[in-house]
Amino acid sequence: MFSSSLLSKDNKSAVDFHEIPLKQTALDVLHAVFGYQSFRKGQEEVIDATLMGKDSLVIMATGNGKSLCYQIPALCFEGLTLVISPLISLMKDQVDQLLANGIEADYLNSSQTFTEQQQVQNKLMSGTLKLLYVSPEKVMTTSFFHLISHCKVSFVAIDEAHCISQWGHDFRPEYTQLGGLKSCFPHAPIMALTATADHATRQDILRHLNLQSPHVYIGSFDRPNIRYTLVEKFKPMEQLCRFVLGQKGKSGIIYCNSRSKVERIAESLRNKGVSAQAYHAGLETSQREQVQRAFQRDNVQVVVATIAFGMGINKSNVRFVVHFDLPRSIESYYQETGRAGRDDLPAEAVLFYEPADYAWLHKILLEKPESPQRQIEALKLQAIGEFAESQTCRRLVLLNYFGEHQQKPCQNCDICLDPPKQYDGLIDAQKVMSTIYRIGQRFGVHYVIAVLRGLSNQKIKDNQHEQLSVYGIGKDKSKEHWQSVIRQLIHLGFIKQVFDHFNATLQLTENAKPILRGEQPLSLAMPRISSLTSVVAPQRYAIAQYDKDLFARLRFLRKQIADKENIPAYIVFNDATLQEMAQYQPTTKAEMLAINGVGATKFERFAQPFMQIIQQHKKVLTQHEPPLSLES
């Protein structure tokens, strides 16, 4: 286990922290312990500031190596590092990964038995721990301070720091107590970290935590390997199933806004042959843990969940995240989509949308008592609505929201890959508006379309609407076409949806009059009916060339090892590391240690069978024989 020395990656000789500068020590830790050849952008800057004893605020996108920003200083400093984390599952996941890298780490939280907590406390007293993960509600208690007073706390890291801000999307009252940490540990640098914080949230974090002249690092919010796609809902369940089946067994998360919908979607996917499980607060704790464990270990392909799922998971090979319903803020959307592609390999973020989703959330919000918090939530809901309705590059809209201004479209979102085609939509708009007006502005989307298309049903007959002049004036176009037209007219402010309990009626706004009179032109986007049947277009994100057959064999071996060790597969090696192995095909110790993600401890613990598989594979290629079985 890692304590106050480490092994050089090249010669494995001991390195004494007192004989070399801390900056060099940090680089040695990166190489020998974590197995990476160089720092990512921003990591070295943040680590250097911490090693100089400065407080810091780190805003860094998920998947960009945020955890290393505090884990490496923790190993460079003498003494203990406290890591404050809001989620029990996240603590365990981080500790498991640190242990796999040979680092003495543990956690204290309410899920542990008295005996387990005593064991952790004994480690603290003996001075063997380098990192201790604790919850925000526990860290400020008298009993914890009595315990920790016997330790040398050299550094404090606060993860998910946006939780301290009421302006943030995930405000947690217990985080507000953390402002006292600076007075409790006056000589320990404090690092606050988050992946999602706009300007107002950042200012709240700095103020509430009492950080002293902090180093502030704001990295790019861009996740170039994630493609953002919006799908208009026409037949949403059919569209969703078709998309998931097109993923061919890849790991994914589907978010919904209700437990009942979660259960329905999970069942529908299972009926289609997809390995899918539901996850929500209505399940027993043991059931939720079982689903989470199965997903982490690649025994379940898809988890359909409410927003509670995923925050505590560091699963690196999630290939897609689907929002079946509109999130309540861009921060939530960004954080949840950020759970895809954490290994830097191509991933999908798909948002299913219709204007009624936004209108319903807005109605629920207005039912809350008037307060500053409601005003904040309203602004955030408006922003995610504008994102969904945008006709410009979705990545630019996201980045602009977080204050990162770029001009060049990304070429990796639905708008860039398939720009909306415009047509003269004045006649279509007049047909829709006239129908809404003639039926008394008392009916919803489906009824308006039924009248437009001249359908014959009992409700239309009862209302005698088949006698109206507008009846059937849109029969030459499909239901999906008129759905798209109505949505665009809502976006443009010519029509509004009015909710009354569970019914939504369409009504004209004042802006509709010039359109009805033909006094102004109107361009509309051609309806994207193709999204009903097509799987999302191929990725344009650059992918390294590697041996696909060898990669599959390495993945299979990894699963066998992970099951035997009773750990998630990505803790052995993540997909990016396996792809690098499949590309460079290392067969010696030096070659394997040059692969990103292979550190000294992981090499000793896991690498040998991977090198054997690679040697077998290379031998087969030279002999032109069929690949050998893994069991051979």
Curated annotation (Swiss-Prot):
Mind listing the GO molecular function terms for this protein? Answer: 3'-5' DNA helicase activity; ATP binding; ATP hydrolysis activity; DNA binding; four-way junction helicase activity; metal ion binding
- Obligatory cofactor(s): Mg(2+); Zn(2+)
**Key word Metal-binding present in the record?**
yes
Cite the binding residues for Zn(2+): C393, C410, C413, C416
Q: Could you name the Gene Ontology cellular component terms for this entry?
A: bacterial nucleoid; cytoplasm; replisome
**UniProt keyword annotations, A-Z:** ATP-binding, DNA damage, DNA recombination, DNA repair, DNA-binding, Helicase, Hydrolase, Isomerase, Metal-binding, Nucleotide-binding, Zinc
- Give, as one word, the top-level EC class: isomerase
Q: Where is the HRDC domain?
A: 544-624
Key word DNA repair present? yes
Coiled-coil segments on the chain, per record: none
PANTHER family in UniProt: ATP-DEPENDENT DNA HELICASE Q1, DNA HELICASE RECQ FAMILY MEMBER
Q: What is this protein called?
A: ATP-dependent DNA helicase RecQ
User: What organism is this sequence from?
Assistant: Pasteurella multocida (strain Pm70)
Q: Could you tell me the gene encoding this protein?
A: recQ
